[in-house]
């Protein structure tokens, strides 16, 4: 979702590297060591994936062929992308992305496979997207828009309990530009490019 790009102040404890300390591979896995009550969101941790992740709702007018419709679509995309990171379900996020944007689609596919195989991602709920300035019309119905991705860490946990932690050590590297155009079904992202930082 669009929100402050400040890094979270705390992180979950580092999962133990010893396989014996990893959560058991048998039976269901629950964050917080137990099944959350219906409707209670519980973030992912070393014990299991996120539970009861709120499902985003697309805002009215997000498919309209207007600048306002485009901006609503891009913000909806960030919400569905975060939802996918926490659940492995990128069904809606795919709809905002061109089939030619292979790197983005491959990222969705990899996350979906991780969840399908019994793994999960820790830290997905803390990722934020801050769109900067106004979108720029590049001609022929194509717009570009700068955005900042705020995150401090991501941990992927395999079904066997083995984990991999990625840390964000350079926030200046998190500026991107996307380009988007309109089709009959709505606004579609054509490219996502990391902006070169000035030195």
Residues covered by each model-derived region:
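Exposed beta-sheet edge and beta->alpha loop/turn motif
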Residues: 1-11, 16, 21-23, 28, ...
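Juxtamembrane and targeting peptides
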Residues: 1-69
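Intrinsically disordered, low-complexity segments enriched in small/polar residues
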Residues: 25, 30, 37, 46, ...
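Polar low-complexity intrinsically disordered regions enriched in Ser/Thr and small residues
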Residues: 35, 42, 121-122, 126-127, ...
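Core segments of small alpha/beta cavity-forming domains
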Residues: 45-122
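N-terminal short leaders/motifs
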Residues: 80-88, 129-145
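A mature extracytoplasmic/lumenal domain signature
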Residues: 97-100, 108-109, 126-127, 148-151, ...
